[in-house]
Structures are given as C-alpha cells and as structure tokens.
Amino acid sequence: MNPENPPPYPGPGPTAPYPPYPQQPMGPMGPMGAPPPQGYPYPPPQGYPYQGYPQYGWQGGPQEPPKTTVYVVEDQRRDDLGPSTCLTACWTALCCCCLWDMLT
C-alpha cells in the first residue's frame, strides 16, 4: 500500500453531526434584521443584563446592598507544654522580681 495513494474509502463516507450554519447577510442591518434607527448606527451591547434597567447606583437606580465584613480569627493552640513554657514563666518571674526590686 502506498501512503501517497491510499485505496478509496468503502461506503458513503463520514457525515457531520450537525448541519452547517446558514450564512448571515452582510450589510447595514440591525440586530433584528432591520436597518438600525436614524442616529443610532451601532447595535446595543449584547451582554447588558436586564435591558432597560440601570446598574446599581446609576441615575437614582436601586442602591447596592451593604456588604458584610467578615473577620477570620484563627485560634492558636499550643499543646507543647514543656521546657519552653517553664522557661517563659521563669523569665516572667525574674523580670517581675527585678522590677519590684527597682521600685522599692
């Protein structure tokens, strides 16, 4: 078998799963198939939500609801009750004794 000249495909051949899209007419047409109104040469933006309603805070429209501030606090647990805890307590007592001695 020659890779540059394969044998013909037996059968009707592969078909596409969907029919092709029809071609859209080109020209000065509006989004609904009619020419745009006078003084409005461009169609409105396609992604605008709720056509006819202003966004939050625009021209007296509804105000955006207040946002709630959330603070995340992590509780630190120290389960290493050992030499470091004892050392911290000793240093605290020594400092307190030194301060007491200086003040009296």
Swiss-Prot record:
Topological category with respect to the lipid bilayer: Single-pass membrane protein
Instruction: Cite the record's Pro residues compositional bias ranges.
Output: 1-25, 33-47
Q: Cite the residue spans of the region called Disordered.
A: 1-47
Subcellular location(s): the record lists: Membrane
Sorted keywords for this record are: Membrane, Transmembrane, Transmembrane helix
Q: Single GO cellular component annotation?
A: membrane
Instruction: Please name the InterPro entries in this protein's record.
Output: CYSTM1-like
Transmembrane region(s):
81-98
Q: Which family does it belong to?
A: Belongs to the CYSTM1 family.
Question: This chain belongs to which protein, by name?
Answer: Cysteine-rich and transmembrane domain-containing protein 1
Primary gene name: Cystm1
